[in-house]
Amino acid sequence: DTVFLQYPADEYFLRDDYVIGMDAEKNHGLKSLARQLKDKGYKIGIITSASIDHATPGGFYASQPDRSMYYEIGVDAANSGFDFFGGAGLLEPRSKRNLSAPCLYDLFNQKGYTMFRGMDAYNRAAAKDKILLFPTDTVSKSLKYAMDRSAKDLSLPDLTKACLANFQETAKKGFFMMVEGGKMDWAAHAHDGGAVVKETIDFDQCIRLAYDFYKKHPNETLILVTADHETGGLGLGNSDMNLNIDLLQYQKCSQEALTAAMREMKSGKMIPSWKDMKAFLKKNLGFWEQIKITPREELELLVCYEESFLKKKSKDVVSLYAKDEPLAVAAIALLDKKASLGWTTKTHTGAPVPLYAIGKQAVLYSGRRDNTDMANVLRKLFLIK
């Protein structure tokens, strides 16, 4: 995964994508490009819509034999000295393997970090160095999906803008930022086409912020946009030559939010009738109103509703990052089908991913490149051996 973007192939041996920042035998830690730049005096920012100790952000600062060692990855984050961490907080602030180990929030504090919950708290403060910027919600494992959040919820563009503004003021030598639209991957694992689109648009806002900075500093800036892999095997076209992507505009919330709402209905004193459920699907997905639903399709939804709400026999549909209500999954799958989207897998694929570059020496990234070239070329640009 992302770790290949951080380490040369001769160090990492392209062997185990569950390892973060270690050699193939898991005996020695390796130094990522970001850590090498930190040693040279650059400011470093790590931004994600997942938690900051997840595999992708962790690949920029951690050295651990397994990506699921969230507490240990968090310790590496605190010890990294990186200047700005923004995301959904920490998955394991207290160690599950060593109960006497310190709380990570205390450790970050000891290392000189200031933590803020939400943009209001951050904007009111004067702190400029060693920032942690997390949501006000202390429970969630990720930022809210773009289509689910309110104006007060922390967003990936918020974090990008805050980090960029901070570094413009404080970075004397220069800076390196990594911004991950992690929820795109989560939505694709769950086959939620509407959420994928909205997360991509949200990520585009982050690119716009970086591009605006580039226009002011064209001779000092390099922007790279890529992915560590494709997820879900998303394809356009599933039955005929027509695409109906515009139907996704009627999806008002993510599959995750649909699941939460349906579970709340289930837990109430009165189980919603099929008529009530149809009204719910009409409001949130446009079914029977903007989107035509055939009698056969309605029957399939009805059977799913009865199994889940009346007979209570159905089990959650499990994907990598979610356990969703079967009716929510069936409804989103129907919408995706009508929008002409097709999926081939619930996991990652080997499909080539795009690489876009603009700015200083961007030509070095032209053509078809191996993923380890991402770090190798940057090392040459920064004169790192």
Predicted regions span which residues?
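Active-site nucleophile/metal-coordination loop of metallo-enzymes that catalyze phosphate/sulfate
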Residues: 1-68, 82, 357
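A post-motif C-terminal structural segment
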Residues: 3-5, 15-20, 62-385
